[in-house]
């Protein structure tokens, strides 16, 4: 959804780039729902669009393999035959965890949307903690969670481990901002008492923070 800062900024730049070249852009927000994503795919194919750029985050959706249109994915692999544009998420996860440790964190947690082998930012985080002999603490708030509920769920996850952690690597900047709000509510000074690092580096979040 473009409600998230990263995808909002991505959509803005893609739309501007295409407009300068004479293309109109259809923006489809799947809101993390696989059924809605399938409906949008059917709609775009039926309208014979010139191509599809997808940044959807639904695992196991096989529909993309059967689309005979120019197609590229952003950030997440959709199919072995679909080109993918993304940063080095695993290296980014390592850099984030290493930075927290260098700044004095001893028990950094990971806050992410989904845990598992496909989460390369988590993989990088785990590698660094394993090398340092630190037990990982992974907190999840599902990607599909409505924006109105995310802050509450993040606070609940953090409250459960507040005595066991002294830093958080949040795999998106909006979550990092919500961790900072949680820390302020508990009189934890950043970065003196508690350390937080995000990932996206969006313009909106840099201005907000």
Model feature map: region roles:
Residues 51-61, 76-81:
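Acidic, Gly/Pro-rich loop/turn segments at junctions of secondary structure
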Residues 2-3, 29, 114, 172:
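Structured beta->alpha junctions
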């Amino acid at each position: 959804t473009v409600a998230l800062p990263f995808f909002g900024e991505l959509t803005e730049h893609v739309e501007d780039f295409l407009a300068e070249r004479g293309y109109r852009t259809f923006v489809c927000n799947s809101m993390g729902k696989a059924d809605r994503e399938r409906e949008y795919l059917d709609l775009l194919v039926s309208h014979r669009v010139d191509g599809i750029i997808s940044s959807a985050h639904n695992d196991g959706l096989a529909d993309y393999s059967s689309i005979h249109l120019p197609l590229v994915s952003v950030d997440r692999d959709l199919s072995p035959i679909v080109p993918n544009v993304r940063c080095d998420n695993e290296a980014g996860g390592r850099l984030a965890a290493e930075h927290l440790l260098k700044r004095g964190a001893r028990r950094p947690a990971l806050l992410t949307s989904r845990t598992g082998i496909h989460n390369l930012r988590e993989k990088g985080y785990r590698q660094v903690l394993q090398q340092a002999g630190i037990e990982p603490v992974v907190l999840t708030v599902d990607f599909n969670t409505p924006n109105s509920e995310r802050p509450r769920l993040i606070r609940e996850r953090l409250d459960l481990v507040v005595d066991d952690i002294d830093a958080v690597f949040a795999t998106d900047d909006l979550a990092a901002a919500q961790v900072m709000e949680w820390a302020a509510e508990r009189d934890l000074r950043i970065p003196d008492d508690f350390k937080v690092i995000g990932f996206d580096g969006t313009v909106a979040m840099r201005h907000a923070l």
